[in-house]
């Protein structure tokens, strides 16, 4: 029965969108997964997609899937680059991972225009500026 399924709470795992400079000194944006737990997370799958509307027309991006074998304790892992041209969309990241034999999953959504200058802070876990998902 559905009521008998235990769904564990996701703790100390989050996402950030960072602003970086490449070797040509051009601005780039990247999405990272941060594991702030005292233990690794295993067999991590991240499904990303963008959706919303612009000028009254529905828009959506491709759905991408990323596999991370292990994200060690107190580290981060690069998921994907992200283009500023999709910041006006909902940018959704569905993260699933294992701790031992227990699966955990959580949906993270950066709502339209939340990835902006006003929301940029220093992300100490990765030593970069970006927008941290709460």
Region spans (language model):
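Contiguous beta-strand segments within globular domains
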Residues: 22-31, 75, 79-80
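N-terminal edge beta-strand
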Residues: 7-24
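Intrinsically disordered, low-complexity Pro/Gly/Ser/Thr-rich segments with frequent PxxP/GP/PP motifs
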Residues: 54-88
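Short acidic, flexible loop segments centered on an aromatic residue
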Residues: 38-55
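A short, structured loop/turn motif at beta-sheet edges
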Residues: 36-40, 71-73, 99-103
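Terminal connector regions
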Residues: 2-6, 80-134
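Asparagine-centered strand-capping/turn motif at beta-strand->loop junctions
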Residues: 27, 31-42
């Amino acid at each position: 029965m559905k009521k008998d399924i235990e769904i564990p709470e996701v703790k100390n795992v989050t996402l950030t969108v960072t602003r970086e400079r490449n070797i040509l000194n051009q601005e780039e944006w990247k999405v990272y997964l941060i594991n702030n737990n005292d233990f690794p997370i295993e067999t991590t799958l991240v499904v990303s997609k963008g959706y919303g509307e612009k000028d009254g027309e529905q828009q959506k991006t491709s759905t991408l899937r990323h596999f991370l074998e292990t994200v060690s304790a107190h580290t981060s892992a690069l998921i994907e680059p992200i283009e500023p041209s999709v910041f006006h969309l909902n940018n959704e990241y569905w993260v699933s991972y294992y701790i031992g034999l227990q699966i955990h999953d959580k949906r993270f959504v950066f709502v339209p225009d939340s990835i902006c200058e006003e929301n940029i802070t220093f992300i100490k876990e990765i030593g970069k500026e970006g927008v941290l998902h709460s």
